[in-house]
């Protein structure tokens, strides 16, 4: 397990990068990204759903609450990224897939 300082640095960096990707995709996407107090939220225009991204320091994971599911991403030192152990998806890839599923739009791309 990575130490707390490294976790905070890497999770802040990963969530900031994701936030910037979400901002770039907002115009065509039907959603809006918003960050408050270290928590990143994705709000959908229809108001029916919300994705919540939070760093969980005690367990050194980034958690995503989306599509009635909790996703717990762990730090992968080799990949230098937070990955979902079950699928191997990194934070950006998983978020892109979840957005596509929520909006039923396979064209959504996070860059």
Go through each PLM region and give its residues.
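N-terminal intrinsically disordered, cationic/polar leader segments
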Residues: 1-111
